[in-house]
């Protein structure tokens, strides 16, 4: 084949002429040689400007360089410049990254001449286009058999975890189903719900089966604790008693605690001791005792509300020179409410004005009878200052513990109670836990309230790292994922997955709140809440009046709310009563009595209302009023207009607009509205704007067409129904 030569002239790019390019085809079909023809103008470097001549020199028409031919390539001159060497190395590295091996390829695309390929020295590697990938995917799908296509269209059966309470939205997400389909299915069963409605576990399990999935019931914390108790062996061992020291702030409670700790140091077991946490252990002969500081009133009330029985013995400190004080009485009430035995320590017996017998007589009013008065309450006369009879006090505690016969399993999964929790810089969340059963070990996974974690470190009351914590031992635990609450339970579980799942379930249940919807409540869109309780504290002048008020209040009955008298006593309203009312959120009633100055001041600071009456009927009316405040209001709904969506439009600056026709009543801008699709309510909110022939309107009547926009909703579909309605709220009474 003869050599052929083709000329290609490119010009007009960026208003600059481009030199002629000569293409020479060699004998090989796949080789193309691109050359630049020599310019008929000499380069600028060939011009000379004499110094004596000011005018422009004549331009030479001959080229100063001879034309290069394709057949005789000019040998490359050696590169001596560092910059050129570095640039050449970068170009070679770029070609290697792009996969350019220097070998000629036979792709048709590379034979196509373009301007960029003509002017550049490198040929960039091209990646596969999206269109090419799409064509390959379609070709692959066409090759599938009919059976394979049907198999791919089958619904996926999933394992769905079901907690005790779950919202419709969350259940739909776990099943990977549309919320509207779930709501529609419930509506077909006669249950009207919203997307945020809470469903009971039984209802959710039924729905999961209806949609063809596999329901998995998640274990409740109570069931886990019960399994732990059932798995405990019969080889029970005695555990140290957990003792709480309570009393009035000026009666030497702190001094007794300090002396007990210092006595333990003198025993020679440790060279020094520092209380790092709010609880500690002491050694008395062969017995260990765990002491915890008096918790705050709110924390103690919270523990009682949770039904936890952390304290085994209460040591009540009473000053022999001062007698029974309000906080002393409060401590007695808390201990009796928790059904915990009391050991009385009559302190400051070294003072001349001390009268221990007077203290014993005062305690008779609160059913604390000393042994020398033919009672069963252990009372010890001590002096924290002189360290008098402290051994007798400890012996009395040990004796009371022996009577209680405190035993537990040391080898089972550990459980405990959180005393306090804090966020420590450098250590993160730290929880102080007292172990009630089992043994906590490093590496254990656990759940505490709504939190979970892995035990990274165990620190005892002396600041020492330990590997395990047996029953009744107080420890600081590092590794929790957040600050737990005082009174939260502490449960060791088998795995991280189990701990995380239980924590998430508890968090989900706390967020949903209220009673979940079951088929028993399918007539209402919202489930009836369990009966609320109104806590009541009654203080009266005489015992007979207190009993009469208590009896009359207990006769007030209602399906949704009930009264609960947590304290009925005689005497004026004290600071103790105000504190208890705040801790338990109770109504405080003073019948024929007045509050003390201290109680009145505390009530003002804590915003606690002290209601004073002298007629029983007025008390009952007040209780009914407070109970009525706990009832949900009666909401009456009236539909004022409906509209059918005919078309959906997109308007710039507004978004999606539902082109609708009013079929009944009137549609008013700003009115409450809901969207109904296939019988299921998918949205409830407000009407934002109404358009009438591109103008905004306040109201559209029956038979007219309009455009409607809703607040925070754009998922319109044809044939949806928009219902505008009004509600009237009426307070309910007991």
UniProtKB/Swiss-Prot annotation:
Q: Which Pfam families match?
A: EF-G_D2 (PF22042), GTP_EFTU (PF00009), IF-2 (PF11987), IF2_N (PF04760)
Region feature G4, mapped onto this chain = 347-350
Tell me the name of the encoding gene. infB
Protein's UniProt name? Translation initiation factor IF-2
Similarity comment: family membership: Belongs to the TRAFAC class translation factor GTPase superfamily. Classic translation factor GTPase family. IF-2 subfamily.
* Natural source organism: Pelagibacter ubique (strain HTCC1062)
Region: G5, residue numbers: 383-385
User: What InterPro entries does its record include?
Assistant: EF-G-like_DII, IF2_II, IF2_N, P-loop_NTPase, Small_GTP-bd, T_Tr_GTP-bd_dom, TF_IF2_bacterial-like, TIF_IF2
**Major localization class:** cytoplasm
Report the GO molecular function annotations. GTP binding; GTPase activity; translation initiation factor activity
């Amino acid at each position: 084949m003869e050599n052929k030569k083709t000329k290609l002239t490119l010009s007009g790019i960026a208003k600059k002429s481009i030199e002629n390019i000569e293409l020479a085809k060699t004998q090989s079909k796949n080789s193309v040689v691109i050359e630049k023809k020599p310019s008929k103008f000499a380069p600028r470097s060939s011009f000379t400007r004499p110094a004596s001549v000011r005018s422009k020199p004549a331009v030479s028409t001959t080229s100063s360089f001879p034309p290069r031919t394709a057949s005789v390539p000019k040998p490359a001159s050696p590169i001596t410049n560092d910059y050129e060497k570095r640039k050449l190395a970068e170009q070679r590295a770029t070609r290697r990254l792009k996969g350019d091996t220097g070998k000629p390829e036979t792709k048709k695309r590379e034979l196509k001449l373009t301007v960029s390929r003509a002017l550049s020295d490198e040929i960039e590697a091209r990646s596969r286009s999206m269109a090419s990938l799409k064509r390959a995917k379609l070709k692959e799908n066409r090759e599938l058999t009919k059976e394979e296509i049907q198999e791919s269209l089958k619904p996926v059966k999933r394992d769905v975890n079901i907690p005790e309470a779950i919202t419709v939205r969350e259940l739909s997400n776990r099943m990977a189903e549309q919320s509207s389909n779930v709501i529609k299915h419930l509506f077909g069963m006669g249950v009207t719900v919203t997307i945020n409605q809470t469903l009971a576990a039984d209802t959710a399990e039924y729905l999961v089966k209806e949609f063809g999935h596999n329901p998995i019931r998640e274990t409740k914390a109570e069931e886990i604790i019960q399994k732990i108790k059932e798995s405990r062996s019969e080889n029970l061992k005695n555990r140290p008693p957990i003792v709480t020291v309570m009393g009035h702030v000026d009666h030497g409670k702190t001094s007794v605690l300090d002396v007990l700790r210092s006595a333990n140091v003198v025993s020679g077991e440790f060279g020094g001791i520092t209380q790092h946490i709010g609880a500690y252990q002491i050694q008395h002969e062969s017995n260990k005792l765990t002491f915890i500081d008096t918790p705050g009133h709110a924390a103690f009330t919270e523990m009682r509300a949770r039904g936890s029985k952390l304290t085994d013995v209460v040591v009540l400190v009473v000053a022999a020179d001062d007698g029974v004080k309000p906080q002393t009485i409060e401590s007695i009430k808390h201990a009796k409410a928790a059904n915990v035995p009391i050991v009385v320590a009559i302190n400051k017996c070294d003072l001349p004005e001390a009268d221990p017998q007077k203290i014993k007589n005062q305690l008779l009013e609160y059913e604390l009878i000393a042994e020398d008065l033919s009672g069963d309450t252990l009372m010890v006369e001590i002096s924290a200052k002189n360290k008098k009879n402290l051994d007798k006090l400890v012996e009395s505690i040990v004796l009371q513990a022996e009577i209680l016969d405190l035993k537990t399993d040391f080898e089972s999964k550990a459980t405990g109670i959180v005393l306090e929790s804090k966020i420590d810089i450098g250590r993160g969340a730290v929880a102080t836990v007292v172990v009630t059963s089992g043994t906590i070990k490093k590496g254990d996974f656990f759940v505490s309230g709504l939190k979970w974690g892995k035990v990274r470190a165990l620190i005892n009351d002396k600041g020492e790292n330990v590997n395990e914590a047996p029953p009744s031992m107080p420890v600081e635990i590092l590794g929790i994922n957040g600050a737990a609450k005082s009174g939260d339970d502490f449960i060791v579980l088998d795995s991280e997955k189990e701990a995380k799942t239980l924590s998430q379930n508890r968090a989900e249940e706390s967020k949903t709140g209220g009673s979940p919807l079951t088929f028993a409540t399918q007539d209402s869109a919202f489930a009836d809440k369990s009966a609320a309780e109104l806590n009541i504290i009654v203080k009266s002048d005489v015992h007979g009046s207190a009993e009469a008020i208590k009896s009359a209040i207990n006769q007030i009955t209602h399906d949704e709310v009930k009264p609960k008298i947590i304290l009925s006593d005689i005497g004026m309203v004290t600071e103790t009563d105000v504190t208890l009312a705040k801790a338990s959120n109770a109504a405080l009633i003073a019948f024929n009595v007045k509050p003390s100055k201290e109680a009145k001041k505390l009530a003002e600071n804590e915003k606690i209302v002290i209601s004073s009456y002298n007629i029983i009927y007025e008390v009952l009316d007040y209780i009914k009023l407070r109970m009525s405040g706990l009832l949900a209001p009666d909401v009456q709904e009236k539909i004022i207009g409906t509209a059918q969506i005919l078309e959906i439009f997109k308007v710039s600056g507004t978004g999606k607009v539902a082109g609708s026709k009013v079929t009944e009543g009137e549609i008013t801008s700003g009115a409450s509205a809901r969207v109904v699709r296939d019988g299921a309510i998918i949205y409830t909110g407000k009407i934002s704007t109404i358009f009438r022939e591109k103008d905004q309107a306040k109201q559209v009547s029956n038979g007219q067409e309009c455009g409607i926009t809703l607040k925070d909703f754009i998922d319109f579909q044809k044939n949806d129904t928009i219902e505008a309605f009004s509600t009237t709220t009426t307070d309910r009474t007991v």
